[in-house]
Amino acid sequence: MPFRSNNPLTRDELLSRFFPQFHPVTTFNSGLSGGSFLIEHQGQRFVVRQPHDPDAPQSAFLRQYRALSQLPACIAPKPHLYLRDWMVVDYLPGEVKTYLPDTNELAGLLYYLHQQPRFGWRITLLPLLELYWQQSDPARRTVGWLRMLKRLRKAREPRLLRLSPLHMDVHAGNLVHSAPGLKLIDWEYAGDGDIALELAAVWVENTDQHRQLVNDYATRAKIYPAQLWRQVRRWFPWLLMLKAGWFEYRWRQTGDQQFIRLADDTWRQLLIKQ
């Protein structure tokens, strides 16, 4: 249910107006993007979310609501309310582990997602790379960063292998292991893009695990594994630049030292993978 309001509500106003019988249970502070909180009434639970990036346009938050509205409940939480600065979605019971599931199981989840109808908006990385450069701490902008940005701008994004709806933030903390199967949470970066971009973006532990995930996916998608891996590798510089830039951007927003450490680690990976 989308609900429009020009004035953002406080948490207490939101609950009293739309969920008067519910009460907050706990706050989730895990992850790099921010927290949300859980409300409950007689065993029914919802997650109340706010935009992770306070500087992002409201349209980005609305897109997340629209993505969740069209996704099947077997892979994503169903949304119940959207209004300015707030979204209420189903709570997904299950376990969030600290490591990725079996690569074949994860490949099955991603392949199923990629068979769904497209969202209707494209993921384009170059505008994000340029935004993160512009919004980063000037003291952190290096000649190497600018040189790599210009190189990618000139090269342009890799040609699409297959255009599908993507989650774009697949890591252990965003996977819920439930009785019916794996489900994904945190859909704020979702959009339509190349399936190889999604596979390149998965937060894997090592190259062997990454190769196995790509091989398992290729089997399901009836693509030659070597062909799919080559396409995944074409996206590596773009993804690493995206991660590094996002960490730099968040460092300037929050002053949280973890983002500097993550940015420095990603810059080192970028040098290795070039």
UniProtKB/Swiss-Prot annotation:
A Pfam family annotated for this UniProt entry: APH
Pathway(s) annotated for this protein in UniProt: Cofactor biosynthesis; thiamine diphosphate biosynthesis; thiamine phosphate from thiamine: step 1/1
The reaction(s) this protein catalyses: thiamine + ATP = thiamine phosphate + ADP + H(+)
Gene3D superfamilies membership: 3.90.1200.10
SUPFAM superfamilies per UniProt: Protein kinase-like (PK-like)
Keyword Metal-binding: no
Molecular-function annotations in GO: ATP binding; thiamine kinase activity
EC number annotated for this UniProt entry: 2.7.1.89
Gene Ontology biological process terms in this record: thiamine diphosphate biosynthetic process; thiamine metabolic process
Residue intervals passing through the bilayer: none
Keyword Kinase: yes
Keywords: ATP-binding, Kinase, Nucleotide-binding, Transferase
UniProt family annotation: Belongs to the thiamine kinase family.
Purpose: Catalyzes the ATP-dependent phosphorylation of thiamine to thiamine phosphate. Is involved in thiamine salvage.
Stated name of the protein: Thiamine kinase
Biological classification of the source: Bacteria, Pseudomonadati, Pseudomonadota, Gammaproteobacteria, Enterobacterales
